[in-house]
């Protein structure tokens, strides 16, 4: 059984500003040398960041953006995140320059004053020192101040946590597969696309649906994931390797790590030699600099706090609010309405990739607390429901408490919606993900523990991608009788990326919500892993552009992040570590799959965690195997126990409020925020209409009377 990590060393040093004075005697790189190197690098990196922003605006205005450029719109770092990533880039490039231009033999040479370098780069700049109000009953938007001993713990724009040390080809930053002749554990790593082609792909969509899980089960997983983590791509740091060279000519270098197509790949005929791939944004190392290996950023808060609704940066949080109203409302769309109900506001910053999808309709992307909200139509639908629920709560609270001002109403509604997401996730979602392993990894709540590290781990960002196996090839829209809606009731998934016009001008969200309730998720199958809609047509909303391969991207991203291999994580979780084909067959209970993996990777040690974890047979009553159950369960337990504002923690809500909150349900959310009147009681389970559906009048409502107060 895993025991909570104690953090005395980490808590003493996690904040970017708590830098220890250097005790070096001889400094090969003097302060002047460091300053000169950093100044030169800043000019180079700043230009690269500016060029990238300019290029993105130009290409999206061209009426013919590429798949990469559409993707980049959502992966583009903004605000404080952009500053943090830029500083990380300057740090790394400065180290390279100092190593090249001075007598240093390696970048961890004790004679290099890393403290001086940190300050010269400006590594403290992205996150100004926060003055915490210890008596505030509300979370900060940034996630700071949750842990009183270490206020930055779990905050946005910090490094993802490492549960095992990073494994890079050069020990610092280069991913395995970067240098052709270099090996990992004695073997060359296979091309990511080759693994996707031989292991992940399938042709026949028959029999792939999950007879026990609704499509909403898949969609809730993406909502939770976007609440917890986001690692935007970085920019290219040198002038030698422009994005054009990476995207059009597959020239590897700097932060360009193209996904090369293997021989006989059908994409060779239409897409050239590769899919472009840009490495994830990373941050400066933190004192005491025990490791200088590249650490990827988490741009959002690590807490399950509805940050995807409210944002993780103060400037965005403010932009999302209706500050002209004293009701504590979120801003809504002023140009279009869903039969009297609100839509998300448009992100009116031009250009918008969503307008390119249908140049006649010209509907922009939506604006939400997470920039990925318009990535696909069901995600935008779920965001819309959460936005409406905030405003419903705020209005109801105003009726109960006419004396509350807009700020109080906003914060209380935000607090309740955060609790809603926590309850739905832990009560309804995780038990049918982890199945028989639920109690092992997430025992009953014992209260807040300030020694538990709530940060999202790097490996979790891959473990949680099991949801990609649950995405079906089509999305259905249903009418009030749960029958096909209109002439285009069933749409291919790839036509719904960046597709906001289908919501605004073609039926609203109700037909899509009914599809989420009455249609099924895809079932992960060892020989039918990821639909071709994601494996060949990702971000291909029109026939004018080519699609990406999400599976290959996941595998390449494992290497980009320096992920240890399959057996390292099996050992971490106390599971057996197969060394041979026979051993792998025993673990996977599948001789054919084990042989395919061994033919590609040569050793189980090298299998990328994303494919290795997903290849395992599912645990009883769950939808992941033993390894992913361990990684997911451990992470969610830490998210819960390391959160001072967790809804069950005494003092966060009153006892009566907690009793009331236990009655929330996703079905009630739908009843309260759509025109739908028939819903299933168990929204994540597969449901057949009308047998499994009830009238909204029979679904418990959230009783807000415990929130009535005489206090302001």
UniProtKB/Swiss-Prot annotation:
The modification Phosphoserine is found at residue 315. Residues 23-100 form a propeptide. Disulfide bonds join 123-284, 132-145, 246-256, 250-274, 354-365, 573-630, 671-696. Keywords: Antibiotic, Antimicrobial, Calcium, Cleavage on pair of basic residues, Cytoplasm, Disulfide bond, Glycoprotein, Heme, Hydrogen peroxide, Iron, Metal-binding, Nitration, Oxidoreductase, Peroxidase, Phosphoprotein, Secreted, Signal. Its main location: secreted. Binds 1 Ca(2+) ion per heterodimer. Binds 1 heme b (iron(II)-protoporphyrin IX) group covalently per heterodimer. This is Lactoperoxidase. It comes from Bos taurus. The gene is LPO.
């Amino acid at each position: 059984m895993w025991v909570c990590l104690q953090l005395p060393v980490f808590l003493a040093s996690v904040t970017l500003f708590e830098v220890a004075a250097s005790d070096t005697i001889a400094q090969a790189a003097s302060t002047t040398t460091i300053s000169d190197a950093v100044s030169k690098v800043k000019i180079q990196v700043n230009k690269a960041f500016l060029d990238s922003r300019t290029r993105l605006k130009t290409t999206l205005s061209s009426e013919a953006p590429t798949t990469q450029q559409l993707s980049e719109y959502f992966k583009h770092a903004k605000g404080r995140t952009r500053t943090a990533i830029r500083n990380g880039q300057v740090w790394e490039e400065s180290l390279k320059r100092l190593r090249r231009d001075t007598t240093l033999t390696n970048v961890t040479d004790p004679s290099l004053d890393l403290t001086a370098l940190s300050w010269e780069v400006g590594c403290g700049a992205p996150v100004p020192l926060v003055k915490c109000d210890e008596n505030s009953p509300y979370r900060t938007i940034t996630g700071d101040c949750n842990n009183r001993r270490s206020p930055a713990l779990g905050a946005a724009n910090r490094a993802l946590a490492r549960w095992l040390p990073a494994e890079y080809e050069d020990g610092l930053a280069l991913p395995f597969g970067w240098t052709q002749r270099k090996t990992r554990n004695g073997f060359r790593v296979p091309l990511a696309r080759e693994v996707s082609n031989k292991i992940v792909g399938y042709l026949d969509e028959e029999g792939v649906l999950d007879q026990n899980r609704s499509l909403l089960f898949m969609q809730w997983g993406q909502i939770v994931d976007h609440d917890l983590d986001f690692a935007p791509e970085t920019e290219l740091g040198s002038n030698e390797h422009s994005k054009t060279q990476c995207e059009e000519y597959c020239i590897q270098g700097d932060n360009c790590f193209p996904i090369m197509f293997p021989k006989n790949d059908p994409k060779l005929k239409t897409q050239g030699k590769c899919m472009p791939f840009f490495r994830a944004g990373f941050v400066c190392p933190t004192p005491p600099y025990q490791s200088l290996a590249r650490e990827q950023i988490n741009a959002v808060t690590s807490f399950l706090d509805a940050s995807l609704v409210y944002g993780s940066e103060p400037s965005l949080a403010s932009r999302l609010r209706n500050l002209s109203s004293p009701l504590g409302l979120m801003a809504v769309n002023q140009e279009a309405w869903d039969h009297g109900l609100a839509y998300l506001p448009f992100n009116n910053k031009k250009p918008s990739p969503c307008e390119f999808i249908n140049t006649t309709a010209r509907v922009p992307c939506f604006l939400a607390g997470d920039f990925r909200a318009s990535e696909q139509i069901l995600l935008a639908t779920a965001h819309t429901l959460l936005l409406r629920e905030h405003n419903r709560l705020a209005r109801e609270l105003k009726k109960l408490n006419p004396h509350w001002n807009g700020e109080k109403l906003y914060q209380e509604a935000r607090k309740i919606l955060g609790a809603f997401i926590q309850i739905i996730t832990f009560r309804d979602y995780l038990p049918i993900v982890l199945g028989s392993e639920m109690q092992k990894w997430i025992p009953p709540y014992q209260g807040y523990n300030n020694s538990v590290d709530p940060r999202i781990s790097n490996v979790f960002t891959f473990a949680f991608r099991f949801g990609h196996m649950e995405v079906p090839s089509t999305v259905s829209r249903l009418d009030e009788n749960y029958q096909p809606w209109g002439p285009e009731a069933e749409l291919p998934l790839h036509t719904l990326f960046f597709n906001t016009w289908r919501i605004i001008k073609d039926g609203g969200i109700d037909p899509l919500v009914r599809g989420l309730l009455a249609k099924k998720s895809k079932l992960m199958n060892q020989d039918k892993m990821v639909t071709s809609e994601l494996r060949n047509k990702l971000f291909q909303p029109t026939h004018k552009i080519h699609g990406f391969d999400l599976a290959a991207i996941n595998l390449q991203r494992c290497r980009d992040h320096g992920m240890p291999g399959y057996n390292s994580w099996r050992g971490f979780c106390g599971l057996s570590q197969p060394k041979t084909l026979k051993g792998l067959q025993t673990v996977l209970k599948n001789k054919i799959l084990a042989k395919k993996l061994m033919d590609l990777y040569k050793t189980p040690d090298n299998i990328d965690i994303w494919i290795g974890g997903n290849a395992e047979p599912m645990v009883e009553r769950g939808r992941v195997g033993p390894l992913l159950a361990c990684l997911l369960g451990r992470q969610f337990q830490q998210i819960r126990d390391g959160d001072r504002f967790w809804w069950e923690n005494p003092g966060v809500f009153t006892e009566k409020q907690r009793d009331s909150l236990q009655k929330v349900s996703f079905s009630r959310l739908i009843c309260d925020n759509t025109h739908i009147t028939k819903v299933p009681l168990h929204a994540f389970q597969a449901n057949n209409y009308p047998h499994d559906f009830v009238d909204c009048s029979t679904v418990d409502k959230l009783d807000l009377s415990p929130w009535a107060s005489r206090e302001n």
